[in-house]
A protein has these predicted regions:
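OB-fold and OB-like single-stranded nucleic-acid-recognition modules
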Residues: 2-193
Length: 193
């Protein structure tokens, strides 16, 4: 039994090393040949189709990194983004904002700081696909509360086995399917709190 325990421990340590230090950077390694001019890209078994350009200045309300799952191969981070009133600290700081399992959640105590419909239609969970390693590094350096400029494409991703991940094309929708899936070509930090 002692030998079995040692083998199990060695395998666990080897997996941890591979996962955290030796595994290639996720979300950037395969897009080095990405060309923003083309509407459709073939990347490591995925077809990435640009649906429409997407750009703007946003407040990062929260961020969540992902290392596991098919989606993490392309999108290693989600930003909960706010614009209009939801970009103002005096508004969003009155909310409890969390992210989990590729969803963004908010709640308030007593009364909402702005109408609930405005909260929902002025914020979104955005799955970010870095177009290259430079963009991936810049996204990794962005923190919650930063004001950022993002530019890229809303996309649909498909694989040969039928799996599909498609961006919402509306800024005012809510619920399942309302997240933006963005291929980020440019990112710039405007300010931080």
């Amino acid at each position: 039994m002692n030998g079995y325990f040692k083998l199990l421990l060695i395998l666990a340590v080897a997996f941890a090393l591979w996962t955290y230090w030796l595994k290639p950077e996720q979300g950037s390694r395969s897009l080095e040949l990405y060309s923003p001019i083309e509407n459709v890209q073939q990347v490591e078994g995925y077809t990435i189709t640009s649906l429409e350009p997407y750009a703007g200045e946003f407040r990062v309300l929260a961020r969540e990194n992902y290392r596991m799952g098919r989606e993490a191969e392309l999108s290693p981070v989600d930003f909960a983004l706010g614009w209009n009133e939801m970009a103002k600290p005096e508004v969003y700081k009155q909310l409890s904002i969390t992210q989990s399992n590729r969803w963004y959640y908010w709640r308030y105590e007593n009364n909402p700081p702005i109408p609930v419909n405005d909260i929902a239609s002025s914020s979104a969970n955005t799955h970010l696909i870095p177009a290259n390693k430079v963009v991936a590094k810049k996204l990794a350096d962005i923190d919650a509360d930063d004001m950022v400029y993002l530019k890229g494409q809303l996309v649909e991703v498909k694989s040969a086995d039928g799996w599909t991940w498609r961006s919402s094309l509306s800024r005012t929708d809510t619920g399942n399917g309302a997240c933006e899936l963005m291929l980020v070509e440019e990112v710039r930090e405007i300010s931080s709190l």
